[in-house]
Structure formats: structure tokens, C-alpha cells
Amino acid sequence: MTKRNHAIVQTIALLAGLLTLGWAGNALAFHDGGVAHCDGCHSMHNSPDNPVEGTPNNQLLKGSDASSTCLNCHAGPGSARSYHSLSTDATVWSPGGDFFWLTQSYTNTNWSGDVESDPDNMGHNVIAADFGLTVDGTNTVAPGGSYPASSLGCASCHNPHGRVDGGTMAGQLPISVSGSYGEVPAPGTIAGAYRLLGGGGDGSGLAAQPIAATAGFGETDVEHPAYGEGMGEWCASCHGDYINDSHKHPSGNSEFLNGQSTVYNSYVATGDYTGAQGTSFTALVQFERQETDVTVLAAAVTSTAGPDSGDNVMCLTCHRAHASAFNNITRWDMEHELLAEGWPTAQNLIDMGAVPNADYYGRDIATEFGDYQRSLCNKCHVKD
């Protein structure tokens, strides 16, 4: 090969690399805060891979149902920068959690005998037939509400078209930036909703879209969502009895932590109350800030500071939104006295094909908190 031809080949390779990077960047910004390009989810002539299919899907979707269409992109291995929500090894460590836990069960033995876990109880049972996710076999309606389990899918919570308060046809300005990262929209435009959540005037019946910001797709103590006002009320769109009725744990904009914030900030672990507010935050026990300015929230997504007395408890303080390793989609095992002895066990994780410590997002609970760490309810209530 001549030097000239070699130079041409190198130039072509460089351009190909740059184009690949460009396409990758565009792929990561597919929604970009609003409605994406239509053929990402729909097949205009029922030919998603060129040949015409025999039977079209509803709405000409590329999956057999809406959630399967979502998972065509959102299923895959997890990482700190992955937008996936369903893996095969429990590596999606996002704030919402991994739908992996809906596909697995395990058996352990206690004083009553063999106990088998119920995957229906580990998450929101979105129906995605192409990925083996089926209707909840236990609940026919949302606990604490009336939303039918047979209708539950990704679009029950997320607006796949990204409309804010009904979109432009309802008089809203066009969307120019994501609503998840505190970006400032260009003049004459608005930001999208946090994580494309539905609500407001979009016809979904959901409460007003909550205000929040996040640093990325993972969740750690130093990179995490900062939740503003309205998250509890939004969850109550389907689970209203849990936020309105008495004799249940309070949650919502008016449920201030008050003196419990002092407890949260001093609590490090069972028997260790040497914490300080500036470093007391743990992603295992989230809280909601009394804040509606998304730029302020965006500045808090890497904060290690705990709550003020005016911050409040919300549904996501104790639960995840998608799925978790624990009953009732909780963030930690609430059914065992000691977290280190909780379920799933290390052997359960191996048997399910999950990576080590996947239940706590890679955190070794015994190493971090000690062998005798009690429930993380004590982060606010310190009864241990």
C-alpha cells in the first residue's frame, strides 16, 4: 500500500469513528425531553426490518405491546451510564430499579419452613409480552387505588411522547431540553418533564408532573436524584389511599421531617450517631426537598448533605418506582431483624444469575454498616 493510499484509509477510518460517536450520542438523546422521531417506536408500513409482517401490532408499534416497544431499547445490561431498566443479571442500579426482579424467585427456610419469594410483589408488574413480563397475578388493581393491573405498562407512568401539560396542541411551548438535568430551555421553549413522567393536562389522569433532577442513570450516595415537590402526590394518582388515609405512614408535601431530620443527619449505623448533616445523605433513604426550582435541584444531585427540618418524606423514601429485590418494592429488606441476614441471600443471587450484592446496588451491607445493622427505618426513627 502506498503512503497516499494508507493516508486515505486512515482518514476514512477516522471519519467513520467520528460518525459512529456522533450516532451514539444521538442514540443516547433519543427522547431529548420530548417526542422522539416516530419510526423509533412505530413502523409506518408494518415493516420494522424491511419485510412486511403478517399481522400488524396495535398503533403500528415495533413491539407486540407498548411496554415491549419501550424495552426494545431499554432492556440490556446496566451500568452507571446505562438507560436500561431490565437486565438479565440485576445490574441496573438506577433510582427506579431493575425489572429483573419480576422475572426471578428464590426459596429460603425460616422457622415456619420453606418460603418462596413472589416476584409479583417485587415491582410494578408492567405487561411486556415480548420480554416475559406479565400481568400481576395477585393484585387486580393498584394497592390503595383502582388502576387496573391489566392495563399497567410503562406508559401508565411515562408519557412516551414527552408532552408537558397537554403539549403544544394544548397551548404549551415546544420542548427544547430534557426536564431531568436542570438544563435551561432556549427562549420561547420549555423543558420536558422529569423522566418523561405523565401528568397534568396530558389526559393520563395523573397528578401534576413532579419536579426533580438527576445526575445520570445510576444512583449512589454522591450521584443521585434530587426530588422536589410533588413526587408523593404524583404516586398517589394510583395509590391514593396511602397518602390520604389515617393510620398510615405520612407522605407528601405537607409531611415535614421536622425533628426527624436531626435524627437522619446524626444516624450513621446501628449504634453510631456521630453523623453530620453535610455528609449524612444515603441513597438508600431518599427525601423530598421543598423546592420547585429545577436548577436548584440540579445543583443538589451530587450533594452528600442530609435534609433540613422543612424537607419531607415521600413514597420514594422507602420504595423504588420500577422494582427491587425486596417485597413491596422497598429499598431495603424490611422483613428481617438484621440486614446482613436478610433475603435474598448471597447464594440466592448466584442461583438467579445476579451479580454480587445486586440487591443493594453493589453495597456490602455487613462491611458498610456492620453485622448487626437493623432496618433503615432507624435512619429517621432511631429505635435500634
Where are the regions a protein language model picked out?
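Cleavable N-terminal signal peptides
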Residues: 15-17, 27
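A motif-centric signal for short, conserved binding hotspots located
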Residues: 28-384
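Bacterial N-terminal signal peptides that target proteins for export
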Residues: 2-13
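A periodicity- and composition-biased signal for non-globular, repetitive helical segments
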Residues: 10, 16, 48-51
